[in-house]
Amino acid sequence: MAGTLPIIARDWALFLDVDGTLLDFVSRPEAVIVPQSLRQTLAALSRALGGALAIVSGRSIADLDRLFAPLRLPVAGQHGAEARRGERICVFAPGSPALASILAPVYALREPTILIENKGLSAAIHYAEAGSERDALSELLPQAIARSDGAYQLLASHLAFDIVPHAVNKGRAVDWFMADAPFAGRVPVFIGDERTDEDGFAAALARGGHAINVGPRRSNIAPWHMPTPQDLRAWLDRSLATLEPSQ
């Protein structure tokens, strides 16, 4: 979109992906580090927006709480399979034995450069950038999912494949948050970097909101774009400076 991305307005509701969006991408998810300055920015933005700031990620809620501790924000984890708003926690897709069946042939590869994250309701399979594992996984995983009970879908992301329940996506997570305070009645703004964020973009746009794509992959539907997570963090800081009262 032509023009300059506006700063955050007080009537917005922010929905933020984590890896590759708020934080620079790393090949091993356990290696990511959340700067204390980012925790402080998110906490202050949440206060300025009346609590209408949520994390929407492929990571589990437990992992997100660990990363951002002691900050405790509204979150949707596992691509929207689970979500928390206040003290209310919803699981939108129960676990299925089919997930273990899908993962079994991946474990059987015994490939040390493949990392399998079984998150309970979903899974992520990470592979090395320079290796041939992607080709093997691209052939194996669709076959494994086809042999399952049809409860899961396969999503390709950066150096990973996500196995996610069919019934969930990040857009539905946005809709769930927007149904109640403090999100209801606000302008939704979804910020992400991958194909798995497209449903979130669509949900925000359908409600008259904004969609912001971060990083080298260009979205087909997000009107706004930021080159890097560093640019996003700088924009959040600039916005916060205008939202907070002068000292």
Which ranges hold each PLM region?
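Short, basic/aromatic recognition patches
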Residues: 1-5
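Asp-based phosphoryl-transfer active-site loop
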Residues: 7-28, 55, 174
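Mg2+-dependent phosphoryl-transfer enzymes with acidic/Ser/Thr/Gly-rich catalytic loops
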Residues: 9, 35, 166, 171-247
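A structural signal for isolated positions on well-ordered beta-strands in alpha/beta enzyme cores
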Residues: 13, 52-54, 74, 153, ...
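Active-site phosphate-binding/coordination module
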Residues: 33-119
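Substrate-recognition "cap/lid" segment bordering the active-site pocket of phosphatases
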Residues: 76-78, 84-101, 155-185
